[in-house]
Amino acid sequence: MSWQTYVDDHLMCDIEGHEGHRLTAAAIVGHDGSVWAQSATFPQFKPEEMNGIMTDFNEPGHLAPTGLHLGGTKYMVIQGEAGAVTRGKKGTGGITIKKTGQALVFGIYEEPVTPGQCNMVVGRLGDYLLEQGL
C-alpha cells in the first residue's frame, strides 16, 4: 500500500459515525522533514517549522512560548503527550501531530470536526505505524 493511500483512506476519511465530517488536511512526514504523502490541502511548510516541531517532541514545552507554526499558520500549543503527541488550537480548528519511530502523522481540522475526533483519527494511524515498526 502506498503512503498516499494511508493519507487518503485513513486520515482524510469520513469520521466514524459522522458521515461527511473529515479532517481539512493531513500528511505523513519523515522525521527529516521529507513528505511521504499529503492531502492536496496540506500547507506548504518551511524546514524551520518542521525543525521546531521535532524539537518539541525531543524537548517537550519548546513550542509553548512561541506557538506551533505550520505553513505560516500559528497554533497555540495545548496539552499533548510528551514525546508522543503535540496538539495545537487556532480559532474553531486545530492540529494533532503523532510521532512514530520514523514519521510524524499530521491531522488539521475545523468545526464541525472536534479535537477529540482529530486525535482519534491521527492516533489510530500513528499507533498502527508504531506497531509496524515505522
Curated annotation (Swiss-Prot):
<dbReference type="InterPro" id="IPR005455">
    <property type="entry name" value="PFN_euk"/>
</dbReference>
<comment type="similarity">
    <text>Belongs to the profilin family.</text>
</comment>
<dbReference type="GO" id="GO:0005856">
    <property type="term" value="C:cytoskeleton"/>
</dbReference>
<dbReference type="Pfam" id="PF00235">
    <property type="entry name" value="Profilin"/>
</dbReference>
<dbReference type="InterPro" id="IPR036140">
    <property type="entry name" value="PFN_sf"/>
</dbReference>
<comment type="subunit">
    <text>Occurs in many kinds of cells as a complex with monomeric actin in a 1:1 ratio.</text>
</comment>
<keyword id="KW-1015">Disulfide bond</keyword>
<dbReference type="GO" id="GO:0005938">
    <property type="term" value="C:cell cortex"/>
</dbReference>
<feature type="modified residue" description="Phosphothreonine">
    <location>
        <position position="114"/>
    </location>
</feature>
<feature type="short sequence motif" description="Involved in PIP2 interaction">
    <location>
        <begin position="84"/>
        <end position="100"/>
    </location>
</feature>
<dbReference type="InterPro" id="IPR048278">
    <property type="entry name" value="PFN"/>
</dbReference>
<protein>
    <recommendedName>
        <fullName>Profilin-2</fullName>
    </recommendedName>
</protein>
<feature type="disulfide bond">
    <location>
        <begin position="13"/>
        <end position="118"/>
    </location>
</feature>
<keyword id="KW-0206">Cytoskeleton</keyword>
<dbReference type="GO" id="GO:0003785">
    <property type="term" value="F:actin monomer binding"/>
</dbReference>
<keyword id="KW-0597">Phosphoprotein</keyword>
<dbReference type="InterPro" id="IPR027310">
    <property type="entry name" value="Profilin_CS"/>
</dbReference>
<keyword id="KW-0009">Actin-binding</keyword>
<keyword id="KW-0963">Cytoplasm</keyword>
<keyword id="KW-0020">Allergen</keyword>
<comment type="function">
    <text>Binds to actin and affects the structure of the cytoskeleton. At high concentrations, profilin prevents the polymerization of actin, whereas it enhances it at low concentrations.</text>
</comment>
